């Protein structure tokens, strides 16, 4: 997964690393194939590229580098055949690359999503939330969906919201409360 292009939780440890060239497909795919080859398992493990793949040309490019296939997220999520809520599809389909924002999620990972009303409001108060971070005795939402959660565990620097609530709102098509993960293109 290319962290500069993918949506959702990104394949880098810090937001500052999202544009690092060490993640470029032109480097990662050949290096990964070389590792698989050296381990003698290149035939057993297909290398699948993901992040920012939107066209036939994108697929051809990563396959020419040695990828066995690709993973498409947003392009399939918004198809007519998909069973997602129509508003969920509309938000993803109509969002432009400049509508995306990067932030640290409750899992402590860089993430990319559409700058919805909820996400904009959260980011405006994030510094205040970080200033009062503290561990809770239990999950206040009663989900305990993550092994480590910035909100429940009081982890400074990690997101301070219930990701389960926000993702569920997005799936219901609730633009005002939803967290809509989405990638960008090149």
Feature roles, as predicted:
Residues 2-25, 29, 33-44, 54-186:
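Conserved active-site-proximal phosphate/metal-binding subdomains
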């Amino acid at each position: 997964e290319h962290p500069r292009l993918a949506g959702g939780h990104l394949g880098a440890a810090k937001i500052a690393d999202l544009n690092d060239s060490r993640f470029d497909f032109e480097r990662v795919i050949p290096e990964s194939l070389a590792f698989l080859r050296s381990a003698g398992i290149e035939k057993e493990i297909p290398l699948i590229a993901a992040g920012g793949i939107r066209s036939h040309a994108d697929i051809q490019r990563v396959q020419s580098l040695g990828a066995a296939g690709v993973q498409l997220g947003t392009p399939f999520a918004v198809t007519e055949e998909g069973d997602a809520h129509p508003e969920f599809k509309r938000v993803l389909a109509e969002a432009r690359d400049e509508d995306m924002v990067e932030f640290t999620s409750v899992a402590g990972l860089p993430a990319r999503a559409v700058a919805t009303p909820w996400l904009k409001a959260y980011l405006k108060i994030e510094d205040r939330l970080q200033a009062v971070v503290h561990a809770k005795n239990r999950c206040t939402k009663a989900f305990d969906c993550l092994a480590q959660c910035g909100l429940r565990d009081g982890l400074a620097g990690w997101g301070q919201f219930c990701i389960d609530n926000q993702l569920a709102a997005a799936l219901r098509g609730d633009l005002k409360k939803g967290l809509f993960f989405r990638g960008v293109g090149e």
